[in-house]
Amino acid sequence: MPALPDYGEFARMLYGTCMISDPWLSGAERFRLQGLVLTSSQADALRTAAEPIGWIYHELAEIVLERPHLLDDFFQLTPFQKAMWLAAEGRWHGIARVDLFLCDDGRIRSCEMNSDTPSGEAEAVLLNELLHPYHPGTTDPNTALAEAFWQMLVMQCGDVAPERAAIIYPTDLPEDLSMIAIYRQWLEARGCRVIIGSPYNLGLDAGGRVTVFEHPVELIVRHYKTDWWGERETIWSNQQEFADAEPLARELLLLLEAESAGCVTVVNPFGAVVTQNKLSLALMWEHRELFSAQASAWIAEYIPETRRLSALNATTLRREEWVLKSDYGCEGDSVVVGPFVKPADWALALAAAIPRHWVAQRYFEVAPIEDDLRPNVGVYLIGGRAAGFYTRLSRKATDYTAVTAPTFISI
């Protein structure tokens, strides 16, 4: 096996991509150069788990579409969140990432699926490209991710290749700039002109077309979270109110009306406001009778027991057995993993959490690899099909401090 480059040399390789410019985070290395090498059977098992989980969410969307009372009675959505869901008419999917774990008992479990604004694509593709030569006897499972993403966009646009697109993202936050850059590269390489901007740069021209910086576009690639378009709600009783709690009413209604009129396509669709909500996981367990027999079996197989905190007696939740998750937290944000926190911190979290915004999910043990690291293997679903892998390694919960590693499959 060729010797891996030292980290300084690797950092220069990353800088050379002109996409990833932060190989260190707070002075710590962000990446592990030694790849996670899956056997073919492990890779197949992960893909086989991810696609049924995508189908579970598809059924869930149909269930909520047929039972709109759940928007109030179960999810307790805000008015603008309900507007997003109703305008989308059940459409929620373009690209998603299912986070999977190989467990001590040999099973595969999923803690959640990011169906709203999944990230990590640049790291998944570029790390594999740069480090694959140092992993002979393996294949790179991410080589087709860009083309799969493009074909999904074409399909969403009525099987017509978009000529002008905008990537809408929170321009004041730098975390996902590499993903914005690689999306832009993928689209421009296929002849699509790309403009980048924030929701505040949206407008309409005289013909009713959506514009970004006054340039008309036919496709919006949305990397601005659904819960940020709507009313911002606090999730802790001791949390300060948001300074910008009001919905982006002008910008959101502009897009919803334009899409309803067939003037623009938004990917991911705004229906992700329901599937991204962690209460979806609770619906799977609290109302399994609403799902097909096959989906119900998949829920039991892959989704840890999840309940609304408002439906539980919080004083009976044993810290060692449960994980608390907020409704729209992602990437480890607003997650309290019981076994990893002190009893006093667990009690404080339960006391401060506003129950209607939280779920409790059964804790499960992840099989560690070397250095006691626990892999979180994200499987990208594009159009419902497994399309690539994104691996993060951590000793406890997966959060922003997790180390990213390339993912390969042994030949």
What does each of the following model-derived ranges do?
Residues 1-411:
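Preference for protein termini
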